[in-house]
Every structure is written in C-alpha cells, then in structure tokens.
Amino acid sequence: MKVKKGEIYLADLSDASGSEQGKVRPVLIIQNNRGNKYSPTTIVACLSSKIYAKHHLPTHCILPDGLGLKYRSMVMCEQIRVIDKSRLFKKIATLNKRQMAIIDKKIKISLDLRLHNPKK
C-alpha cells in the first residue's frame, strides 16, 4: 500500500492496551515519505472525536471541518505508534502543508525535540 505523510486513513487498532488508542479509528500518517515508500510499516498519530471530553494538551491539534471525517476531530500527537500498513483500509483525507507544519510542531513538543542552532 502506498501512503504519504499527511494522509488520514481509517485503521484497525483493535489490539490496544491500557491508555493506548484502540478500535477502528482515523490515524494521520506522520512518517516521512522515504520511509513510507520502502517500509511495510508506517508511523501514525491517532485522531479522536472526543475533543471536548479530553483535557486539552499542547500536543493536541483540532482539525478543520470539511476533511471528510465523520466527526470534528483532533490529532493527538502524544498518541504515536508504528503500525503495519495492512491495518490501514480507507483513505479519508490529506492535510495541506500548513496543517502539517502545525502537526510537526506538536510532535516536537510531544517528543521534546528542540531545534538546535549552533553558533557559527
């Protein structure tokens, strides 16, 4: 299956444990396209439609309406996992570059990645 960074798919995550996100749900592909091209797995961030029931974290990104999702949803950039591409079964939408730039910032917050600018 060919997938690209920024695409949203339905995925079967039914083997979740504890506080992991499970069941069939939308996920956002966050792995780079080189990895997506050559690997049988991909890296995803889970989406949730419970945007008002959850505590808002700096790693959450509410998605705009009109993407084809059944409910208004948010990307939970703290809920990242590697999945086999066979778990993906329906493409729903593709985020634009501006939206993905926001997601990338939220992932950096989640993983505590800081840009390092060495002095010249």
Feature map (PLM): residue ranges:
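Conserved functional hotspots at enzyme active or ligand-binding sites that engage polyanionic ligands
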Residues: 1-120
